[in-house]
C-alpha cells in the first residue's frame, strides 16, 4: 500500500460543486455509507470496473493522504484493504485531477 496518495473517483459535476464550496463532502454513495470511499493506485482500475462501467463524465482525484486526518484503511468484503475517510476534506488536499475518458467498450482510459 502506498500511504502518500489515495484516489477518489467522482463525476465532473460533483467535483465542480466541491471546487465551488472549497470542500469535498462525498458522493451520494459516500454520504449513504458515512465515509468517503478512496482507492490506492493499484485499486483504481478495479474500482472503475466494478462501480463505474459505462459511466461518462468522471474524474480521478489524486489526494495527499497525509493531509487527511481521519483516513483509515479498512477491510472490504473482498478482503482487500481500502482507504476510507470519516470526514469531509478541503479541496487543497487534491494534488492532481485526471479526466477519465470513456472508451467504446465501457471501460475508462486512465
Listing of model-derived features with the role each one plays in the protein:
Residues 2-110:
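Conserved, structured core segments of small domains
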Amino acid at each position: 500500500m502506498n500511504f502518500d496518495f489515495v484516489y477518489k473517483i467522482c463525476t465532473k459535476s460533483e467535483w465542480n460543486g466541491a471546487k465551488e464550496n472549497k470542500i469535498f463532502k462525498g458522493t451520494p454513495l459516500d454520504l449513504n455509507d458515512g465515509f468517503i470511499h478512496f482507492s490506492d493506485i493499484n485499486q483504481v482500475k478495479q474500482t472503475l470496473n466494478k462501480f463505474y462501467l459505462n459511466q461518462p463524465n468522471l474524474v480521478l482525484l489524486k489526494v495527499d493522504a497525509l493531509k487527511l486526518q481521519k483516513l483509515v484503511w479498512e477491510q472490504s468484503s473482498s478482503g482487500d484493504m481500502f482507504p476510507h475517510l470519516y470526514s469531509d476534506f478541503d479541496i487543497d488536499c487534491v494534488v492532481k485531477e485526471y479526466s477519465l475518458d470513456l472508451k467504446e467498450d465501457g471501460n475508462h482510459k486512465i
